[in-house]
Amino acid sequence: MSTMGNSTNIFWQESPVGKLERQKLLNQKGCVVWITGLSGSGKSTLACSLSWELHTRGKLSYILDGDNVRHGLNKDLGFKAEDRTENIRRVGEVAKLFADAGLICIASLISPYRKDRDACRAMLPDAFIEVFMNMPLALCEERDPKGLYKLARAGKIKGFTGIDDPYEPPLNCEIELNQKDGVCPTPSAMAGEVITYLEDKGYLQG
């Protein structure tokens, strides 16, 4: 007797409309722009600016924000290492579906562990654009938009990335954004750099 959940009894159902047809309809190529970096590095700011700039160009995108997905999809997960890994795995699987639908999926998460990000890259070998927000810890802590660094320094939050849990920077990211002469680029400038990459690689045409 078979049981539900037995992978030998689960089969992939093909769609009558394929990825190429969807991309042609949208006049763009589906991909995942994965924005990673410390809390306060500007990930969500870039994600919102990028999504808006794409919208003004008639391109369809969707943001998967690290905080937002914990309100629903990942509300059962905590912040232990294994939960963080599962958090990233789930977001990676959802992002893959968005890309297959022909959308430009913008994933904005700290995603501190290199192996977890690389696992997501492996899901999308031809459509994964890793954007590293390489901002100094001191700057992120100074911004502290959610007051989390202050809580972590006071010992009220354990396992906080950058304080008592490591952030592993990318080794092979497509785009690295950082300060220039001690000045942070504007959200529009950062979005423009990503859009230039997408244009050069052909993602903004079907």
PLM regions: where:
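ATP-dependent NMP and nucleoside kinases share a basic, alpha-helical "lid"
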Residues: G72-D83, A95-R153, G159
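Small-molecule kinase domains that catalyze NTP-dependent phosphoryl transfer to phosphate-bearing small molecules
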Residues: N134-G192, Y197, K201-G206
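Conserved substrate/cofactor phosphate-moiety recognition/catalytic segment
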Residues: C48-E93
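Conserved lysine of the Walker
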Residues: K43
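The conserved Walker
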Residues: S39
